């Protein structure tokens, strides 16, 4: 995982006049980005027939028939 490394005082951005006590860090750097950029290059894109197809879902609920029946019995309220 990447770590954010703090900058030293020389690389801090100063704002305001010299008498003001204000500093703001304007940059950060990442360490070990090889896993971020090279992680998924071995995975192939899906074939055209696979795009948009849902995986099979198994619903294990004893009262699913009652729930589905109740939804279809309800009539939409007047709009």
UniProtKB/Swiss-Prot annotation:
Subcellular location: Nucleus; Cytoplasm, Cytosol
Family (UniProt): Belongs to the CAMK2N family.
Disulfide bond residue pairs: none
MF-aspect GO terms: protein kinase inhibitor activity
Alphabetical keyword list: Cytoplasm, Nucleus, Protein kinase inhibitor
Free-text function comment from the UniProt entry: Potent and specific cellular inhibitor of CaM-kinase II (CAMK2). Traps Ca(2+)/calmodulin on CAMK2.
Region (Inhibitory domain): 43-69
Protein name, per record: Calcium/calmodulin-dependent protein kinase II inhibitor 2
Signal peptide extent: none
Superkingdom of source: Eukaryota
InterPro entries for this protein: Camk2n
